[in-house]
Amino acid sequence: MHRPKILMASLSLAAVKIVSGAEVVRPLLVEIRHAPEALIAADGVKAGTGRFSFDSYDHERVLSVVAGNVLTLASREELALMQQDGLEVVVVMESEDKLTLIKRALYGEKLQLDPIYHRYDQIVRRADELAKAHPELITRLQIGETTQFRQPIYAYRLSNDVTRLQERPAVLFNGCHHSDEVMGAEIVVALMEKLVAGYGHEQEVTAWMNSLEIYLVPVVNVDGHNVVTSGHDPRWRKNLRDVNGDGVTGIYPEGVDVNRGYDFNWAMGGTDDPLKANYRGAHPFSEAENCAMRHLADTRQFLLSVSYHSQGEVIYYPWSWHGLPAPDDAVIKAIATDVAAHIRTMNGQGTYAIAPGGPSSQSYPWFYGRRGDFDFIIETGKGSHLFPPAEVPGIVAANLEGVRALLAHAAGPGLAVQVTDATSGQPLVAEVWLPAIENEMVDRRHSDARFGRLWRLLKPGKHQVIVSCPGYRTVVIRDCLVGENSWTPLKVELIRAATTP
């Protein structure tokens, strides 16, 4: 989850006064069925105006608001007030154990996650089956291990020939930085199935696999994902680091927020309080899960990437930094707008929204600011982190339409740069700078070591490009014309600088 608070459901002002007083004992799980639209509050409504708030970092009251039905913890006094208000209220469960009530609300009657969701071992097993059946289309890469239990974190590379790294743009999709946001894993697994099954049969899928390298990380936070999918605790967001060093893990809310651990304005993001849901850890890349993603980015430059979260039906893109947009805002925002327009909301009445996110500690500012990758957080679904089974296929299908839109942008327009040594023809790691676009907010982009390649999405038109490499003469191209619809090739051969005797 990206933003901490979305205000979802309204009750009487008297109920809020009860809530805002001394600590309230809430032994009831209550469902408000068919809540009137007027009782669904807009983002930004403050507590004390007659509304309960759904807070993604808090499980004290409202636990989910899906399809107009509200699941909330309540005291007996609050239940009476809801009934007085004429709401259609059903007591789902009564228990003195708060976790049991939360499990009933988020897991369902069996107090276990519905099997429509995949456990990590099931994901790995299915991916291995696909790789065995189609070894040319999908291969497994171990990119790291989890912080606490040293479980392998896997990425999967898909293309028409995965037996070798190919000289083409790469795109990344990942899920479950936050372990309770399990929808991300479902979307990535569905995409894996689609790519393998569709190659050679669906024209669009075949074109993607023939022109791109597609990387999938279904679950970044494997330890935390296991906590949720095992039925231990549906609230679990963070990894399983034993922060207090007592040798005990899995006691809520211990752990580190994996999506606050990236080294881009790290100290500005999250909190240094270990008890908070967005605890950022001891230092940047303190968590092995973040290091695994960094390792993947070290081995392959990505043109575009998506990190799936829940909830909100919104796409966050880089960024608004003290009110200033990202250097590539014109292109990034256009892509976000297009992708969002292709993802239908759960109620079928609209499409996802877009918003610039903050510039600190999360995946998208790091991938963009440090690596030049246009990275997006897509908050899937609305009103919960664990969605009822009936909602899952629709959310997955809607987001696969977003994948289609995103991958269309991997065809350009922009520059397909290749930098080589003018004498040997060997690829060079060279800085490729567009001074009219890039400023000191972001790191300079470089061609890769294997191919001397850099794919750079740009608006059509003329661009100044400066290519430099230590020991070589700098090349300045003042009016490099980028075409309208596809990649414009730019081959740069650098000449060694004269050495002083």
Question: Regions from the language model: what does each represent?
Answer:
Residues 426-460:
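Short, acidic Ser/Thr/Gly-rich low-complexity loop/linker segments typical of extracellular
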Residues 183-228:
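Short helix-loop-beta-strand segments that form the rim/entrance of peptidase-like active sites
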Residues 470-498:
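Structured interaction patches on ligand/partner-binding surfaces of diverse proteins
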Residues 22-111, 472:
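Extreme N-terminal flexible tails
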Residues 71, 139-142, 154-157, 170-174, ...:
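Structural recognition of the beta-strand scaffold that forms the well-ordered cores
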Residues 223, 229-422, 429, 454:
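Metallocarboxypeptidase
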Residues 115-171, 243-247:
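Soluble metallo-hydrolase cores and metallopeptidase-like ectodomains found primarily
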Residues 460-471:
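A short, solvent-exposed beta-strand micro-motif common in secreted/extracellular proteins
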